[in-house]
Amino acid sequence: MRVCSFCHEEIEPGTGKMYVKRDGTIYFFCSSKCEKNMIKLGRVPRKVKWVKK
């Protein structure tokens, strides 16, 4: 199973989204909420309260 790059929640096979940056870095996201917070808004997961510790 894959793990979300933002909230570290397990992602079921066949769900979620894989995001590849131009430099080759691969991110996996469980939801659009996680994707937007990391990519678009540039938030750091450890500073967001709803992310698992």
Swiss-Prot record:
InterPro entries recorded: L24e/L24_sf (IPR038630), Ribosomal_eL24 (IPR056366), Ribosomal_eL24-rel_arc (IPR055345), Ribosomal_eL24-rel_N (IPR000988), Ribosomal_eL24_CS (IPR023442), TRASH_dom (IPR011017)
Superkingdom of source: Archaea
Co-factor binding details: Binds 1 zinc ion per subunit.
GO BP annotations listed: translation
Single GO molecular function: structural constituent of ribosome
Zinc finger (C4-type): 4-34
Record-linked PROSITE patterns: RIBOSOMAL_L24E (PS01073)
Alphabetized UniProt keyword annotations: Metal-binding, Ribonucleoprotein, Ribosomal protein, RNA-binding, rRNA-binding, Zinc, Zinc-finger
Cofactor section: Zn(2+)
Gene3D superfamilies linked: Ribosomal protein L24e
GO cellular component: ribonucleoprotein complex; ribosome
Pfam families membership: Ribosomal_L24e
Positions bound to Zn(2+): C4, C7, C30, C34
Recorded family membership: Belongs to the eukaryotic ribosomal protein eL24 family.
Functional summary from the UniProt entry: Binds to the 23S rRNA.
Subunit structure: Part of the 50S ribosomal subunit. Forms a cluster with proteins L3 and L14.
Name of this protein: Large ribosomal subunit protein eL24
Organism of provenance: Methanothermobacter thermautotrophicus (strain ATCC 29096 / DSM 1053 / JCM 10044 / NBRC 100330 / Delta H)
